[in-house]
Amino acid sequence: MNEAPIPNRVAESSLVAFDLEDFWPKGGIRAIRLTEFAPNGLIREADVREYVRNLEKHTYDASVVCLEGADEVIVPQWLGPMIATALAGHAVYVGFGSAPEVLSAYYAQTLAQADWNAYRGAKVLLKGCGTHPVPDSAYAAAALHLAKVAQKVMYGEACSNVPLYKAAGF
């Protein structure tokens, strides 16, 4: 009996994968609790300078840094820039809020700066079901950018996906 091999349609498809996990910060997500240097809820410049001076900056390499606890202390406007400049060259993003909030802002900035031309006219699969907690807002932002350049956008995996967008004329 001579059986023909079963074709692997997924491998043979012209789908181009777009994986938001490729943008996940290599150093992960790190948090700095503002209450650590704010006795009685008051942040003083001298305390912050001391904190920054003793900060082991290498531990923030390639990470997204969340400045948490802003609702528990009085936050001067210079605080974010002071910590961000101290971590420049180490952290990829510094922002105020919880990990999900700051991660959403990081993805928004990163995706806004991405080069989408590689997906022009392509059938793109926006991959889901990853190992990291990529924010839902990142999926929406990626779909928005992809719909501007791609022929077709789908969400999920190659073997099981949800059609999201199809350009006119296709």
Locations of regions flagged by a protein language model:
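Short, flexible, solvent-exposed loop/turn segments with mixed acidic/basic and small polar residues
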Residues: 56-58, 115-118
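Long, charge-dense
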Residues: 79-117, 156-163
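Short glycine-rich or small-residue beta-strand-to-loop segments that form or flank ligand, phosphate
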Residues: 64-70, 95-97, 123-129
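N-terminal, charge-rich interaction modules
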Residues: 1-80, 84, 90-93, 150-152, ...
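A domain-level signal for the structural core that forms small-molecule/cofactor-binding pockets
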Residues: 52-53, 112, 137, 145
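Gly/Ser/Thr-rich loops at beta-strand to alpha-helix junctions
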Residues: 70-77, 129-137, 160-161
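Short, aromatic/basic amphipathic alpha-helical patches
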Residues: 80-86, 137-146
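Extended, charge-rich low-complexity interaction segments
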Residues: 116-140
